[in-house]
A protein has these predicted regions:
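Basic/aromatic recognition patch in beta-strand/loop cores that engages polyanionic ligands
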Residues: 38-83, 88
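Enriched for short, Lys/Arg-rich terminal
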Residues: 71-125
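Sequence/structural signature of beta-propeller domains
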Residues: 17, 21-26, 33, 46-48, ...
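Polybasic/polar functional segments that serve as interface/processing modules
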Residues: 28-30, 101
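Arg/Lys-rich, positively charged N-terminal/basic patches that mediate binding to nucleic acids
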Residues: 1-23, 119-125
Length: 125
């Protein structure tokens, strides 16, 4: 199982998409065990779109939510970036993909700085 980290905006996006607390917990369990699940989104720096069925909609994955995750496998957690229902959005725009690329670069850079600081005996972690 991998560590999962939610970005600050993930919970509010999950509520808008209709996910319950149980849905979120189910998804976290799923993605912790399967961090490479979903299809990679070109131009995002490695984000993946994971289709996930939510409780009570009886439509399976196709009627569920689309969660955007980021996982590099380089000792970083799996990041839950955002989530949306199919009725909210089908695909990401070019501008959204570009924003995700900047975000994923910042995540990797920040973690690299933290590791270097820890290796040097610093306090930043």
């Amino acid at each position: 199982m991998h560590t999962v980290s939610e970005l600050r905006t993930f919970r509010s996006a999950a509520a808008v998409a209709g996910m319950s607390q149980e849905d979120i917990e189910d998804f976290v369990d799923h993605i912790a065990a399967n961090p490479d699940d979903g299809e990679e989104i070109v131009g995002t720096g490695g984000c993946r779109k994971v289709r996930f069925a939510i409780r009570g909609n009886n439509k399976g994955k196709s009627g569920g939510v689309r969660t955007i995750t980021f996982y590099t496998g380089n000792d970083l957690p799996v990041f839950l970036i955002t989530v949306f229902s199919k009725s909210q959005k089908v695909n990401l725009t070019k501008a959204e993909r570009n924003s995700l690329k900047k975000l994923t670069t910042a995540i990797v850079d920040e973690y690299a700085m933290r590791v270097q600081a820890l290796a040097a005996g610093g306090e930043r972690a």
